[in-house]
Design a protein with these regions (language model features):
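Generic N-terminal amphipathic, Lys/Arg-enriched alpha-helix
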Residues: 1-21
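Catalytic cores of large soluble enzymes that bind and process phosphate-bearing ligands
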Residues: 4, 19-22, 26, 51, ...
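Short, glycine-rich nucleotide/cofactor-binding loops
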Residues: 16-26, 111-120
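A short, well-structured juxtamembrane/interface segment
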Residues: 22-38
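Glycine-rich phosphate-binding loops that contact phosphosugars or nucleotide phosphates
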Residues: 42-149
Length: 149
């Protein structure tokens, strides 16, 4: 292994250890929430825009993965029509409402909202819709970055 590879690996491992140390309780809470929902017939819906939506895509239909994971797919929130358009649309009112309306998400389900900052209109709107419908949410974001955004 080269010096550069060892250095990179060491840095990544230290970051992962820090995240696990700081967030382990939250990870366990989320796992329990998802498990409880699944046992009641619920699904884990995953919402994100731009690159954040890729986590939902990655979790879907994976061998050995969680079968009840369902990405919220909306071409307007992808880069399919261009990055500039997707970036503008994630800041547009009612865009999350439009995307979520395609799915029958109920109070027995979980909505995971993925966002690098948590401040753009679409993830905030998704969270407010979920709250109104009494859908439990999990937020995956960078709190540090969201405080700077």
């Amino acid at each position: 292994m080269s010096k550069l590879t060892r250095s990179y690996s060491s840095k990544i491992n230290s970051i992962l250890k820090k995240i696990l140390k700081e967030e382990e309780k939250k990870f366990l809470q989320c796992a329990k929430l998802i498990s409880k929902s699944y046992k009641k017939g619920g699904q884990l819906y995953i919402f994100g825009t731009g690159h954040s939506r890729l986590l939902g895509e990655e979790s879907f239909h994976r061998a050995g993965g969680f079968a009840a994971a369902c990405p919220i797919r909306d071409d307007d929130l992808s880069f399919k029509k261009g990055a500039r358009k997707a970036t503008a649309l994630e800041r547009t009112p009612n865009i999350a409402k439009k995307a979520l309306a395609k799915y029958k998400i109920t109070s027995k389900d979980i909505l995971m909202i993925v966002s690098n900052s948590g401040v753009n209109h679409a993830p905030v709107e998704a969270a407010l819709i979920a709250k109104k419908k009494k859908i439990k949410t999990i937020s995956l974001t960078s709190v540090k970055y969201s405080k700077q955004a």
